[in-house]
A protein has these predicted regions:
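Membrane-interfacial segments at transmembrane helix termini in multi-pass membrane proteins
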Residues: 246-306
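Structural signature of hydrophobic alpha-helical transmembrane segments
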Residues: 1-14, 51-69, 124-139, 185-196
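Transmembrane helix-loop junctions at the membrane interface of multipass transporters and ion channels
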Residues: 104-118, 183-188, 215, 222-243
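Transmembrane alpha-helix boundary signature
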Residues: 48-61, 73-84, 99-117, 184
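Structured cytosolic domains appended to multi-pass membrane proteins
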Residues: 285-463
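Cytoplasmic-side transmembrane-helix entry/capping segments in multi-pass membrane proteins
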Residues: 31-40, 60-63, 82-94, 157-169, ...
């Protein structure tokens, strides 16, 4: 295949990837966006296989079959509630792939057209080093994020003295290693960059709490894009450079949007420690307060006699896998002539769009799902707000308590509703570690129990 034809096909793939991003920006066009992405990837793979430098189609075919089989197995078995962990795992694979490609280019540079072992060009060494650095950080950071999201590692921030100073010194040490590697081209220095970068990736994610996980997932998405971009430079592959830049830039923009939704800077998220000692002290102030409790029958009666209900899903809904029961409850209320809407906070859940994905899986109509800016003005005119596992994003302390770690974070104004029904397992705090003032409001009724079972019991009572 001629170089011109390769360039045209790669450009077509890049355009399809851009269309895919555009399509995925809205639920109604997301299916078409996925199709664009798949077609673009198929064109990219076939074009790459047409290169004269391909030595063994059998090995490549075997890798595609094995990888495709694993991917299909995961896609068929994965539950929608586990998508954040899956995304983090995929990011780790991109990171380690960048490291492997850089290692292959370093040990066999002739195959990549960048020189011979020990005499690689300076620009190629710099590209290789940066790709390795970003890839290793992405790998270890994503693995740790996976553990936090999966629950195998505590989601609480882990902080220690001089943490940020140590991270800064390690970063400077890596820069020094990169300079030494460019000068000496030593395998020992190369693997030192890999190991130290992996350590830095762990240290960067360790102090970040579960409440910040949506931003972390976005940041890791950005890192994986830049890692792929680095691979593109190493391989002199324009499509990888373009695609990596698209993913890196979109992830960075999404991180900014998510941080803005929490009224925090990306830097403050990276520094971590969200929900530390200050949050812990804040929980003790409400220990002597009482809450009003109710049950499924009470909730069914209140909602059945209301004109409007806003449902506010959060991470608790995801954990309980209550989205289908919740949708069934909403359908029954709509049949009774009640106006039902769903309110989504931008950082609800553990990844960007987490609640949107779960509601879409339960076939909740797109037009009923509204974002914070679209729905907040409706709460004062709403008779009932049904909150299901959305803790920090509904906490009025974000507006009233200047000492609170979440102060300044935009929240859903559910407290302005006439009645708030709050479904929760217990009075435990959210990931921020801050007690929710909403629990103690006169217009709030707590519905303690499993979110899915509570919704199912409400459905029975409504029927």
């Amino acid at each position: 295949m001629s170089a011109n034809m390769v360039a045209v096909l790669y450009l077509l793939s890049a355009l399809l990837f851009i269309f895919a991003l555009r399509g995925l920006s809205h639920p109604e066009s997301s299916r078409l966006g996925n199709i664009f992405g798949v077609v673009g990837m198929v064109i990219a793979i076939i074009t790459t296989l047409m290169f004269k430098s391909v030595l063994s189609y059998a090995e490549i075919g075997a890798a595609i079959i094995v990888g495709g089989a694993i991917g299909t197995f995961i896609a068929l078995r994965i539950e929608m509630t586990a998508l954040p962990q899956l995304v983090a795992a995929f990011h780790s694979l991109v990171g380690i792939a960048a490291v492997f490609v850089a290692a292959a280019a370093f040990y066999d540079p002739a195959s990549f057209g960048i020189g011979n072992f020990g005499s690689i060009g300076t620009s190629s060494l710099v590209e290789m080093s940066i790709g390795t650095f970003i890839g290793a950080i992405t790998f270890s950071g994503s693995i740790l994020a996976f553990g936090k999201l999966q629950g195998t590692i505590s989601g609480k921030p882990i902080v220690f003295k001089f943490q940020h100073t140590i991270n800064a010194l390690i970063f400077l040490f890596i820069l020094a290693l990169i300079v030494m590697f460019v000068i000496n081209q030593s395998p020992t220095i190369f693997w030192s960059i890999v190991i130290v970068s992996i350590i830095l990736g762990l240290l960067v994610v360790i102090p970040i709490g579960g409440a910040d996980m949506p931003v972390v997932v976005s940041m890791l998405n950005s890192y994986s894009g830049w890692a792929a971009c680095g691979i593109g430079f190493t391989l002199s592959n324009n499509l990888l450079i373009i695609t990596g830049a698209l993913v890196g830039a979109s992830g960075a923009i999404l991180s900014y949007i998510m941080s803005k939704g929490m009224n925090r800077s990306i830097i403050s998220v990276v520094l971590g420690g969200f929900g530390g000692e200050q949050a812990a002290s804040a929980t003790s102030d409400n220990s002597d307060k009482v809450v009003k409790q109710g049950n499924a029958e009470d909730a069914a009666y209140i909602m059945k006699n209301a004109d409007s209900v806003i449902i506010v899903p959060g991470y608790g809904m995801a954990v309980a896998q209550a989205q289908h029961a919740l949708r069934e409850m909403g359908d029954i209320l709509k049949k009774e002539g009640i106006n039902v809407k769903y309110a989504i906070h931008p950082v609800a859940g553990r990844m960007p769009g987490h609640m949107n994905v779960l509601l879409a899986e339960a076939n909740v109509p797109y037009e009923e799902v509204l974002e914070l800016d679209e729905i907040n003005h409706d709460f004062p005119m709403t008779e009932v707000s049904f909150v299901i596992g959305a803790n920090d994003v509904t906490n009025p302390a974000a507006k009233t308590d200047e000492t609170s770690p979440i102060y300044g974070m935009p929240i859903l104004d559910v407290e302005k509703s006439q009645t708030v029904l709050f479904v929760k397992r217990s009075m435990a705090t959210g990931y921020s570690g801050v007690d929710n003032e909403l629990f103690y409001r006169d217009n709030t009724t707590m519905l303690f129990g499993d979110a899915k079972k509570m919704c199912e019991d409400i459905v029975k009572s409504l029927n």
